[in-house]
Amino acid sequence: MTDRTPPQGRARRLFSRTSWPEARFLADVLRTETFGGGLLLLGAVLALLWANSPWADSYAALASWVPWPGGSDLHLDLDLATWAADGLLAIFFFVVGLELKREFVAGDLRDPRRAALPVVAAIGGMIVPALIYVGINLAAGGENLRGWAIPTATDIAFALAVLAVIGSHLPQGLRAFLLTLAVVDDLLAITVIAIFYTGDFKLTPLLVALLPIALFGLLVQRRKTWWWALIPLAVVAWTLVHESGVHATVAGVLLGFTVPVLRGREGDRHGLAEHLEHRWRPVSAGFAVPVFAFFAAGVSLRGADLGGIVTDPIVVGIVAGLVLGKVLGIFGSTFMLARFTRAELDRDITWTDLLGVSLLAGIGFTVSLLIGELAFEGGTAGDNVKAAVLTGSVIAALLASAVLSRRNKAYRRIAAKERLDSNRDGVPDVFQHRDG
């Protein structure tokens, strides 16, 4: 990526465009995630309809079905819903691991100046929702406080699906910011899950898991993509991490971290991390996450005490954290960063745009539901968490739609400018003259 340090005397610009190669890569990612977001929404809606239909018992029976009762020796006698959360989401987190490594080695996060904005925004978007949740639940104390991390996550696929529905054409700099913010957000979520939501910890299986992870890393570092060897090694690593008490999805991240980013040979078009990300992202976005959403979102509201749900501190804390906390954290930290560094917004961006993106980041679906399952296993509290995450995400989506749709005319004009290639060399003019 080219150096984007502004000339001396010129104010630094926030949300400026990336380089053209990075823009093309991000466009491919966003297309896949947008499609996956549509499937995610479909899975969640089907789950809600089924769980509240006369056939709700069959939904519960499907979710609780144990496909391998004989796996008790390895603690793998899991029901389908748990397989979706612990198994399929490991694919999602493997892609996250690839994303993180690519961003830190060859993407925006390798440059401290460009990394500062999404990192500061993500940290603010984690701390403020957590503080709001804790503040609301402090009096209740006890088990309620275990849910402090639920409203801290951002679901990029859900957010992109909302953008597709409202027909918004966010400027490239804002799209890059939203995606990088989500990547940093995922890193923080992984750290939180590994540290705060580990069960009965066993050191020996975790240490043994390092062996298949190391062998996996050795093969991919040598550019050996022998699936007959890599997939069994990944399964063994996942099994051992699961046995250790650390959430099994962490294995996916660790495996992703072992994959090299830079091209091994001069003739290679892409590094192996980008190649594997291209292969596995459709599986993650198009299958793993929608199936998890199908099993995680099926909360039954039939006969529920709606008054009790609405006044439950857990529910209030999650909804307030997602809707208010994310906006205050992301918008506020970005505003303070601009003030302290005397930076200016890119010419095509307004503070209203950032407000809309901050609201989009309040859509915390997949990882929020996962953390909710880890914090409150089943029961009334577990169902209330699902209802709260769904409610908060829908409110955030509606508010973001209201804010961003008002700027659609300007976004279409910017999108046309970003496509203009007057000399027909395959690179739009704005990416050749980014300082102009």
Swiss-Prot record:
Transmembrane segments: 35-55, 80-100, 116-136, 147-167, 176-196, 201-221, 226-246, 283-303, 313-333, 354-374, 385-405
Membrane topology of the entry: Multi-pass membrane protein
Catalysed reactions, as listed in the record: Na(+)(in) + 2 H(+)(out) = Na(+)(out) + 2 H(+)(in)
Subcellular location: Cell membrane
Pfam families: Na_H_antiport_1
Any one GO BP annotation for this protein: regulation of pH
UniProt keyword annotations, A-Z: Antiport, Cell membrane, Ion transport, Membrane, Sodium, Sodium transport, Transmembrane, Transmembrane helix, Transport
GO cellular component, one term: plasma membrane
Entry's Gene Ontology molecular function annotations: sodium:proton antiporter activity
Keyword Ion transport carried by entry: yes
Family: Belongs to the NhaA Na(+)/H(+) (TC 2.A.33) antiporter family.
Function: Na(+)/H(+) antiporter that extrudes sodium in exchange for external protons.
Protein's recorded name: Na(+)/H(+) antiporter NhaA 2
Species of the source: Salinispora arenicola (strain CNS-205)
